[in-house]
């Protein structure tokens, strides 16, 4: 990142971890001087409402009225994705301050999203670490498989949120193999007819959600209890439990699968 210049003007992404400074329901706009940012470093990461968008180097001690990134899923996709870019870039920079090959200090490259080792004898270049995770909706006839994960424990007597299955891709594994493995590990079910649906950047802290649709093949539900509280089949015409929020690829997968169920 470069030192911010007094004349730099645009929208500014200021954040700590996944908390965004979002006053008046938008990012702050103005010159660096008017926003008291001239002592900071930043990088331009795109355009926001026709103006440059800068992400400011993260300061963990910064105190502001924050808005959780998850709550901004309601924004148009292109805006939410830009916020993810900035948050992930700062996460990459703060976790790669030193070269993983020789241990010397790194600095951000000028020609691409990367950090460059400052040891002339090394010069190793490291790129942002993006951890792909599959997310899959499984259909059986007119039914959809939904699960209540341990991180969505029911509260106040409710049923808790039910959603799709997901998991990280392992080394030497295709996305389709990950779908098969994750579904089987978490529920004991085998799936077939796996097909790509879409993807979503997910800065929690550095994932890429890769969405798939799949059909039930065989097996009975057997829970991986350290991951799931419950998993069951829901008929497309019956009342559904609490679902993921708008803007998530999980809800898009669920809605797409329900539409297929109703046409089956």
Swiss-Prot record:
The motif Nudix box: which residues?
A: 167-188
Its GO CC terms are:
cytosol
Which residues bind Zn(2+) per the record?
Answer: 99, 102, 117, 122
The residues that the entry says bind a divalent metal cation 1 are 166, 186, 227
What cofactor does this one take? Mg(2+); Mn(2+); Zn(2+)
Per the UniProt entry, the Enzyme Commission number(s) are 3.6.1.-, 3.6.1.22
How does the cofactor bind to this protein, according to its record?
A: Divalent metal cations. Mg(2+) or Mn(2+). Binds 1 zinc ion per subunit.
Q: Which residues are involved in binding a divalent metal cation 3?
A: 182, 186, 227
Q: Domain of life of the organism in this record? A: Bacteria
Signal sequence annotation: none
Annotated positions binding a divalent metal cation 2: 182
Against Gene3D superfamilies, the record matches this protein to: 3.90.79.20, Nucleoside Triphosphate Pyrophosphohydrolase (3.90.79.10)
The residues that hold substrate are 70, 112, 127, 200-207, 250
What catalytic activity is recorded?
a 5'-end NAD(+)-phospho-ribonucleoside in mRNA + H2O = a 5'-end phospho-adenosine-phospho-ribonucleoside in mRNA + beta-nicotinamide D-ribonucleotide + 2 H(+); NAD(+) + H2O = beta-nicotinamide D-ribonucleotide + AMP + 2 H(+); NADH + H2O = reduced beta-nicotinamide D-ribonucleotide + AMP + 2 H(+)
Q: Where is the Nudix hydrolase domain?
A: 128-257
What CDD domains does UniProt report for this protein, alphabetically? NUDIX_NADH_pyrophosphatase_Nudt13
Q: Which family does it belong to?
A: Belongs to the Nudix hydrolase family. NudC subfamily.
| Function summary | mRNA decapping enzyme that specifically removes the nicotinamide adenine dinucleotide (NAD) cap from a subset of mRNAs by hydrolyzing the diphosphate linkage to produce nicotinamide mononucleotide (NMN) and 5' monophosphate mRNA. The NAD-cap is present at the 5'-end of some mRNAs and stabilizes RNA against 5'-processing. Has preference for mRNAs with a 5'-end purine. Catalyzes the hydrolysis of a broad range of dinucleotide pyrophosphates.
Assembly notes = Homodimer.
* Protein name stated in the entry: NAD-capped RNA hydrolase NudC
**Origin organism of this chain?**
Actinobacillus succinogenes (strain ATCC 55618 / DSM 22257 / CCUG 43843 / 130Z)
The protein's gene is named nudC
């Amino acid at each position: 990142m470069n030192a911010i210049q007094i004349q730099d003007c645009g929208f500014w992404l200021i954040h700590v971890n996944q908390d965004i400074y979002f006053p008046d329901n938008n990012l702050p706009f103005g010159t660096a001087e008017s926003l008291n940012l001239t002592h900071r470093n930043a990088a331009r990461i795109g355009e926001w409402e026709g103006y440059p968008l800068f992400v400011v180097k993260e300061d963990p001690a910064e105190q502001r009225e924050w808005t959780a990134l998850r709550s901004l899923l309601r924004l148009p996709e292109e805006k939410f994705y830009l916020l993810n870019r900035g948050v992930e870039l700062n996460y990459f920079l703060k976790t790669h301050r030193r070269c993983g090959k020789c241990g010397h200090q790194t600095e951000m490259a000028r020609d691409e999203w990367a950090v460059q080792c400052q040891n002339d004898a090394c010069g190793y270049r490291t790129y942002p670490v993006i951890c792909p995770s599959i997310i899959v909706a499984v259909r059986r006839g007119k039914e959809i498989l939904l699960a209540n994960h341990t991180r969505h424990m029911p509260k106040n007597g409710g049923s808790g949120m039910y959603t799709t299955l997901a998991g990280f891709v392992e080394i030497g594994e295709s996305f389709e193999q990950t779908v098969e493995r994750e579904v089987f590990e978490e529920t004991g079910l085998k799936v077939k007819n796996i097909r790509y649906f879409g993807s979503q950047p997910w800065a929690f802290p550095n994932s890429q959600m890769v969405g798939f649709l799949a059909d039930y093949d065989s097996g009975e539900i057997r829970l991986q209890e350290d991951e799931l509280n419950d998993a069951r089949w829901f008929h497309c015409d019956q009342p559904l439990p609490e679902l993921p929020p708008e803007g998530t690829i999980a809800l898009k997968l669920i809605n797409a699968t329900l539409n297929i169920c109703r046409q089956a």
